[in-house]
Amino acid sequence: MVGKSVVTLDGLSTNQILDLLHKAEYIDSHRKEVAHTCDGRVLATLFYEPSTRTRLSFETAMLRLGGKVIGFAGAQLASVTKGESIADTLKTVSNYVDVVAIRHPKEGAALVASRAASVPVINAGDGGHMHPTQTLADLATLQSRFGRITDLTVGLCGDLTFGRTVHSLIETLCRFGNVRFVLISPDELKTPQYVIDRINATDNCSYVEVRDLASVIGDLDVLYMTRVQKERFFNEDDYLRLRDTYILDEEKLQLAKPSMAVLHPLPRVNEIAVDVDDDPRAAYFEQVKNGMLVRMALESTVVGDELPGYEPLNSKEVHA
């Protein structure tokens, strides 16, 4: 993976994905030992779209490894306002840094960036397409909660049309197999056909589409909640009509398994009641920590810096 861009997780083998999860676990228990892994390295965070968690997570990951960060947060701060192309920006920034994290509202922007850059580019989310590092955070959370990322019934609820984290997670779980997906959404926000096709192409994965969360929550090992994304709507009336379709509260949680894990890519609006935060099944703030850890693992890997004392996955057993 040294020197390699990560636009989607499809470019990584399942063993490479598992090794990144393994590295993240190691980093969590060896914070002091890895604190100088990336001394002298510089990360550029090029965020053409607003972000809080993802940008800060990428930046904190490099800082905790001993590196430094430059970048911008918002297209209005970039030379795009002067008409500069993504390709030219990346060719320029490649002269300054060792690795780039890019977020952009247009699908395919990360691929364009990776082709133009002479350093590794990590996709921090492009349009409604892919969000590979969020998926790594999701997988790390499943691994820590269940000790595996297969043999699970995973419910995905809310905006399944525009939710890039949903698409990315489904497609990656299909590569490991043995997952039953329960797709919970209003008709207006159903899962895109290309994602359904991916499930259908996997022999040991299956799905059902439903509109009612309460009727299926008791069957779920994982409930992945998403917000209805106002920024994806052209008509505010449509957004307001769909915004409150699914709200997870303690009353609904009474119908769920005691071992179920509630995930959410954040930010939330009102789709998870605040009183759920204290429920032991709430795993979304664990996802935040895991997101930083997997980004530390990924950043150090693509620039070729080895974690002191780390034993590669092939010498240890990790269950998919």
From Swiss-Prot:
An individual GO BP term: amino acid metabolic process
Molecular-function GO term, any one: aspartate carbamoyltransferase activity
Annotated pathway: Pyrimidine metabolism; UMP biosynthesis via de novo pathway; (S)-dihydroorotate from bicarbonate: step 2/3
Catalysed conversion reaction: carbamoyl phosphate + L-aspartate = N-carbamoyl-L-aspartate + phosphate + H(+)
EC number: 2.1.3.2
Pfam families (alphabetical): OTCace, OTCace_N
Keywords for this protein: Pyrimidine biosynthesis, Transferase
InterPro entries noted in UniProt: Asp/Orn_carbamoyltranf_P-bd (IPR006132), Asp/Orn_carbamoylTrfase (IPR006130), Asp/Orn_carbamoylTrfase_sf (IPR036901), Asp_carbamoyltransf (IPR002082), Asp_carbamoyltransf_Asp/Orn-bd (IPR006131)
Residues noted as binding L-aspartate in the record, renumbered to the chain: K82, R164, R227
PROSITE patterns: CARBAMOYLTRANSFERASE (PS00097)
Binding site for carbamoyl phosphate: R53, T54, R103, H131, Q134, L266, P267
The keyword Nucleotidyltransferase belongs to this UniProt entry's keyword annotation: no
Record family assignment: Belongs to the aspartate/ornithine carbamoyltransferase superfamily. ATCase family.
Subunit structure, interactors included: Heterododecamer (2C3:3R2) of six catalytic PyrB chains organized as two trimers (C3), and six regulatory PyrI chains organized as three dimers (R2).
HAMAP family assigned to the protein according to its UniProt record, in alphabetical order: Asp_carb_tr (MF_00001)
Its biological purpose: Catalyzes the condensation of carbamoyl phosphate and aspartate to form carbamoyl aspartate and inorganic phosphate, the committed step in the de novo pyrimidine nucleotide biosynthesis pathway.
Protein name, entry field: Aspartate carbamoyltransferase catalytic subunit
Lineage of origin: Bacteria, Bacillati, Actinomycetota, Actinomycetes, Bifidobacteriales
Gene for this chain: pyrB
